[in-house]
Regions:
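Intrinsic-disorder/low-complexity regions
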Residues: 119, 131-132
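A short, amphipathic alpha-helical segment
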Residues: 58, 126-129
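M16 family metallopeptidases and their MPP-like homologs
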Residues: 6, 10-115, 133-141
Length: 147
């Protein structure tokens, strides 16, 4: 999604310097997934750009990512994984997870990443979008009072 929004929002529309997409999963207190898409823009462009965000999410849920994007994403994930292994926080987080859940996230990571297909991403996003569970937050700076 970062690649798509960089092309659409930043390069094509000139609407923002960058768009940040992030996701998180949690098990407790209940299982949930959060997908956040955050960007700053001119207030006059917020409606148009918000529409593009939803349009591109729906497109990805229907068509999936391109082969080029999949390759770039996998390369990035594997690089971040190798870099993370040099950090104590990576190992502490994984030890903590293993202690509490018994799940070893360090095992077979590269194999898992390489096994993900564009169809997997498309189907996952399609299921997510079918939930119709969206919250849109728009924050603006109040206009200065006329003096």
């Amino acid at each position: 999604l970062d690649l798509v929004y960089t092309a659409e929002i930043r390069e094509k529309e000139g609407g923002s310097y960058g768009v940040n997409c992030s996701g998180s999963l949690s098990r407790y207190p209940k299982e949930q997934l959060v997908l956040q898409i955050v960007f700053q823009t001119d207030p006059a462009k917020k409606d148009k750009l918000s529409g593009i965000v939803i349009e591109q999410l729906n497109k990805m849920a229907k068509e999936g990512p391109s082969a080029e994007h999949m390759q770039k994403i996998k390369e990035y994930m594997l690089k971040k994984y190798k870099d993370a292994q040099k950090e104590n926080s990576y190992w502490l987080g994984n030890l903590d997870e293993y202690f509490y859940t018994g799940i070893d996230y360090t095992k077979d990571y590269e194999t898992l990443v390489n096994s993900i297909t564009a169809k997997d991403v498309q189907e996952f996003l399609a299921k997510l979008m079918k939930q119709n569970n969206e919250i849109q937050v728009i924050m603006t700076v109040p206009e200065e009072e006329a003096k």
